Curated annotation (Swiss-Prot):
Protein name as catalogued: Leucine--tRNA ligase
Organism: Vesicomyosocius okutanii subsp. Calyptogena okutanii (strain HA)
PANTHER family recorded: LEUCINE--TRNA LIGASE, MITOCHONDRIAL (PTHR43740:SF2), LEUCYL-TRNA SYNTHETASE (PTHR43740)
Cellular localization per UniProt: Cytoplasm
Family from the record: Belongs to the class-I aminoacyl-tRNA synthetase family.
Pfam families, alphabetized: Anticodon_1 (PF08264), tRNA-synt_1 (PF00133), tRNA-synt_1_2 (PF13603), tRNA-synt_1g (PF09334)
Record keywords: Aminoacyl-tRNA synthetase, ATP-binding, Cytoplasm, Ligase, Nucleotide-binding, Protein biosynthesis
Gene: leuS
UniProt xrefs under CDD domains: Anticodon_Ia_Leu_BEm (cd07958), LeuRS_core (cd00812)
Origin: domain of life: Bacteria
Amino acid sequence: MNIKYDVQKIEKQAQKYWKEKKSFEVIEDYSKEKYYCLSMFPYPSGRLHMGHVRNYSIGDVISRFQRMQGKNVMQPIGWDGFGLPAENAALKNKESPAKWTYKNINYMKTQLNQLGFGYDWAREITTCHPKYYRWEQWLFIKLFKKNLIYKKKAIVNWDPVDQTVLANEQVINGRGWRSNALIEKKEISQWFIRITNYAEELLNDLDKLYGWPDPVKIMQKNWIGKSIGLEITFSRRNSDPLIIYTTRPDTLMGVTYLAISFEHPLALESGKNNYQVQSFIEKCKTIQTSEILNEIMDKKGIDSGFKCIHPITNNEVPIWITNFVLMSYGTGAIMSVPAHDKRDFKFAKKYGIFIKQVINKNESIDKGPIINKGKLFNSEEFSGMDFNQAYESIAKTLIEKNLGNKKINYRLRDWGISRQRYWGCPIPIVNCKYCGSVTVKVKDLPVILPEKVKFYDVSSPIKKMPNFYQTICPKCGSKAHRETDTFDTFFESSWYFARHTCNNNNNAMLDKRVNYWLEVDQYIGGVEHSILHLLYARFFNKLLRDEGLIKYDEPFKNLLTQGMVLKNGVKMSKSKGNTVDPTKMIKKYGADTVRLFILFAAPPMQDLEWNNSGLEGAHRFIKKVYRLVSIYINDSKDYIVNHLNINFLNKTQKHIRRKIHQNLVKITDDINRRYTFNTAISTLMESVDIINKFTKTDTQSIALRSESINIILLTLSPITPHICHYLWLKLGNKKAIINEPWPKVDLKALIESEVQIIIQVDGKLRDKMMMMINTDKEILESEVLSNKNIIKFTKNKNIIKIIIIHNKLINIVTK
């Protein structure tokens, strides 16, 4: 065997074998336990980055390990093909988004193969291909007919850079999730899907996700934002009432003003005849009003001049127009209780509004509001009640007066799914002046997005293409216009996990194979997708279930959220100029080294700091394994390597074998249960060092080295598959290591024949001795008392008694 580690030759040989043998292609096999491992598919941006490499290395280790457990493992891959970067590249490079996207897919596919990931390429999907997106158009039509899809004018989040609408979930700290531009508010006709119809189920089913990290579930729970409260009507003389929602009806008697959104119809009415109000509203329109930004922005308002009637006291309450109440949340109006709310308190102090305390009589509001619940006072017939009593009593009173009712509210809003961009799935709607919005006939699907387009600015080219948008109404046959908005790209990524199971079915969205493979046993991706993608995918899963296409309530049984890859303490990004090209690292060190380092440098759930010295260390370890096997092959060439006979092992050999099998137990647990691949690798390194030092060449030693090296290669193979494939065959094995099972622990090897005994004199540690397990008391005492060190500490002393803790400790008590 060549003593030189030729990394490029070895890795190409392994990859050629897997490709020719179709090692990772699978079909449904009901005689085996299935295992579906899926990493979040990449956007084809042009090059893989180290975040991709980390994500997919984790998935590959899990997949290969589960395969070695005898399971029928599917690990597919695909491409999240639609998106704004393709349009930006089209403007910059003067090439179509389609050409740019498919070119990137080809390059990134080569990179994935160079890294040795065990994907079933026969299940590859590309979301920008009509074969894929025709089925989400089909689903859209189904949902439209069930009234789960609707169109309305709405105040939306408008990204001025990307020139498109963003869902609430896509606004991060008041900025666009892609462009980072400050988001504006704009009224526009939008398509929505009724995700709120599933709010309760999405919330309750979080309890079924035992294999999900708690922080992700908490984020989704908070985003859905269920609250239980009262809907209260504040009447207005000779006008429509204001309806508000509150979770603190116990503070109702402390209401001293109502706050409404500057977009509220009442605010607009007030502004018609009041220049100051009109000016205030215009200023509000220019500021950013995302929910998160509202927490830090300066709270401003103006008296509308209108008043409403308190539902219990019948006193008049002023209505203030504000810049912080969201029209998109509830009714766009809230009751304000400055004595018991921080924001209301500051606002009231700022504008000199009356403050009325109604909770906890013995506490003062001089320094600030009283937020906590307590006993009511100054509240007429409700005085003296606690929160629960007041809640029920006030609710009863309001219901009797027909001025209120109990209500469950959600923070979650219906998902705005239309985008004013080109590179997305066409919405299968025809707009007819006679029939309104009409769905395309199913037989006419897919509505194909024209791919040969030219970009002159950020606007969508299909809006200027009559040959695309001019059509006939499917209902009445009149001339009509095709919808030129496209789906939010999260539409595609919300169901791809299911399509992987039957991607070659051209006659149906899904077929019975989906119920063999789902649920996804292990899903892997970044925690930044907790609210967006993961919530939408759960929602789509329920839509597909209700269409009778799948039988499961949830798509992902277990979720692993890996940390980011950092360099110099910050996330790798092109803008920061701190990226590392995986292809260059593969050419220099090999794919196995890159995989090993990225799995060893940190636990998968934590951020990983990239450093070249760590990469060098990983490369040295692989070369050490290569040399270990090379030396063994040379040492054993004159032997017929027999199965190990444990009855003939000497003390040293038994100790080495015990340690190898103890390490096997730990490695198995680290990979299978704990997903701490870094500690599994550390233990593997320990095993390599043990066998490296054990160079004896007698028959039993050769057999022990053979067993140990086999265990090392088998357990290392999911992590560094290329070198293990090569060395396994060099050892003379007939089957490739990819087809071998995980090694079994010999429980007998774990049994200790000796134990370490702690020896104390008068409670102080004086020595340690190795003794046979369950040594007789008389023999143990004799051995200890004849120990030179113990003789020194007991000299000229009377031994009163000897205390023995079985197989652990002996304490000699003297006087």
